Amino acid sequence: MKRLHRPDLLTWSAYDPALMIDFNSLVWTRPDGNVLIDPLSLTADDEKHLRSMGGAAWILMTNSDHVRGAREIAAGMGARAIGPIAERDAFPVPCDRWVGDGDQPFPGLVVHEIRGSKTPGELALVLEETTVIFGDAVRAHRADTLMLLPEAKLRVRNDVLQSIRRIRTLHPRIEHVLVGDGWCSFRHGGTLLDELAGSA
């Protein structure tokens, strides 16, 4: 696992040769139990590292296409699962908790829904006002730029952009943008989001 911009955040990844990007997962280490976000399957080394940090208490999935290795990790570590409430009726993994817009499942973490993405109520997560975590809707296929999912995969592109603008209005101090697919932005992330949200 790799360290990120905060001492309590780490990531592990898997390279996708077709898209030429990494798929990313996150660990948020907490005294009250670690939280995994959109977890890929663990390599033996990553599992050993995670267990050395206390394992996983919770797994938070931003959308049904980012279930990834959640089921096997939950079974192996006894972690409880959190999913987007808008997908509750058809979510592929049983969840112990459902969250939606404005919820705070853990102190310091605020949930926002991305409307118009490819799945209903996709979650974006804002951590302590300065870091935002996106699952599918916002991504980066090259460094220092952000993009949306291809329009053919979005339900309503303008709704996605409006959701991003709303997040920026509510959290003007965002500086770091972490994505499930592609390059993360560790500086000037708010500016990159503003550029994306202003795109036609």
Task: Report each predicted region and the residues it spans.
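Short, charged/polar "capping" segments at the starts of alpha-helices
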Residues: 44-46, 69, 87-92, 185-187
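Residue-level detector of beta-strand structural context in well-folded domains
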Residues: 1, 24-26, 102, 123
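A short, flexible N-terminal coil/short beta segment enriched in small residues
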Residues: 1-14, 56, 67, 77
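Pre-active-site segment of Zn-dependent metallo-hydrolases
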Residues: 17-58
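Metallo-beta-lactamase
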Residues: 2, 10, 16-18, 34-36, 72-75, 79-121, 128-129, 155-171, ...
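Active-site metal-binding motif and surrounding structural segment of the metallo-beta-lactamase
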Residues: 41-84
